[in-house]
Regions:
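C-terminal catalytic-base region of ester-bond hydrolases, centering on the histidine
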Residues: 113-247, 258
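Non-transmembrane, juxtamembrane loop and terminal tail segments
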Residues: 252-258
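Serine-dependent carboxylesterase/thioesterase catalytic core
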Residues: 1-91, 134
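Intrinsically disordered, low-complexity regulatory regions of eukaryotic regulatory proteins
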Residues: 81, 250-251
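Short amphipathic alpha-helical surface micro-motifs
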Residues: 12-16, 105-109, 166-171
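Serine-hydrolase catalytic core
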Residues: 73-138
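Active-site gating loop/helix substructures
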Residues: 52-102, 143, 147-149, 155-182
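Alpha-helical interaction elements in eukaryotic regulators
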Residues: 12-16, 96-99, 202
Length: 258
C-alpha cells in the first residue's frame, strides 16, 4: 500500500470512501470509483411501489425523523438524507446532519484538509445508472442536487443544479474544480437500474481505472459479491430498529428481545 490503492464504492459506499479520502487518506487512494453513490444525498427514501399509499405514508413518517439524535447515530441512510423539499427540513439537515453536510464542506467554516486530500486523487470516477430509481435525485451520483429552499425562486423542487454551476464547484469547497481542471474527473453512465453491473459496465471501469494488471473475471465477480448487500437490506434493518425506538410506548425504557 505504500504506492496507494484504487478504491471502489458501491452505492452508499461511494460517499463513505470519499469521506475516508477527505478525512484520512492514509494509505493514499489513487483512483476513487463510485457506482450509484449519493454524493449530494437523497431527498426521499426508496422502496415503495408507485401508488402504494400505506408504504409512502410510513416512509414519509420516517423521513420526518431522519434528523433526530437516534437516527443520526443509528441509521446509515440518515447520514446522507438531504431533504430540500421544505425549508424547515433543510434547516434540520444543516443543523443536525453528522456526515454528508461535513464531507461536502457545506458549513461556513471550511475544512481545508478535505480539499487537500481530494486533490491527491489521480482519478475520481462517478458512474450513474440510466434507469436509476433508488437514488433521488439520480443526478446526485454526479454531485448534482435539487436547489435548496434558500435559493429557489419558486416552489419547483425537482430541478437539479448541475455540478459545474453549483457553489460547491465554483467555490471549490472540496477540490472538485481543481480535479476537473486537471482532467481528473470522469462521468460515466451504465445501462440499467441501481447497481445492475452489466459486463460492458464492468469492463468500462475495471479495465480502465482500476488495478494493475487488469482485473480478471474472478476478481470482478468477487467485487460484485459485495454489491449484493443491497441498500434495500440496510434500509429495512434501519427502519425496523427505528420503528422499535421511535414508536415504543411511553415509559417502556427496557431493552429486550422477544
Amino acid at each position: 500500500l505504500q504506492a496507494g490503492f484504487d478504491a471502489i464504492g458501491f452505492s452508499q459506499g461511494g460517499q463513505f470512501l470519499r469521506g475516508y479520502v477527505e478525512r484520512f487518506n492514509t494509505p493514499r487512494v489513487r483512483n476513487l470509483v463510485t457506482f450509484g453513490a449519493q454524493h449530494m444525498g437523497i431527498t426521499q427514501l426508496p422502496g415503495c411501489a408507485e401508488g402504494d399509499r400505506l408504504c409512502n405514508l410510513v416512509l414519509r413518517s420516517f423521513e420526518g425523523r431522519m434528523y433526530s439524535d437516534f437516527a443520526q447515530t443509528h441509521l446509515v441512510v440518515a447520514q446522507y438524507f438531504r431533504d430540500t423539499r421544505l425549508a424547515s427540513q433543510y434547516q434540520q439537515y444543516e443543523q443536525r446532519n453528522r456526515f454528508l453536510y461535513d464531507i461536502n464542506n457545506e458549513g461556513p467554516s471550511k475544512q481545508e484538509l478535505y480539499k487537500t486530500n481530494i486533490k491527491q486523487l489521480e482519478k475520481f470516477v462517478m458512474v450513474r445508472f440510466s434507469e436509476e430509481e433508488t437514488v433521488v435525485p439520480s443526478e446526485s451520483t454526479w454531485f448534482s442536487a435539487y436547489e435548496d429552499p434558500e435559493h429557489r425562486r419558486d416552489d419547483v423542487v425537482n430541478m437539479t443544479i448541475p455540478l459545474r454551476t453549483s457553489r460547491l464547484y465554483k467555490e471549490d469547497w472540496i477540490g472538485l474544480r481543481h480535479l476537473d481542471a486537471r482532467g481528473s474527473l470522469a462521468f460515466h453512465t451504465c445501462e440499467g437500474q441501481h447497481m445492475q453491473l452489466s459486463p460492458p459496465c464492468k469492463s468500462l471501469v475495471f479495465h480502465t481505472y482500476v488495478g494493475h494488471p487488469r482485473f480478471d473475471e474472478a476478481s470482478m465477480n468477487i467485487l460484485e459479491g459485495f454489491m449484493n448487500i443491497s441498500l434495500y437490506a440496510l434500509i429495512c434493518i434501519g427502519l425496523m430498529i427505528c420503528m422499535r425506538r421511535l414508536y415504543r410506548p411511553p415509559g417502556d425504557d427496557a431493552t429486550h428481545v422477544t
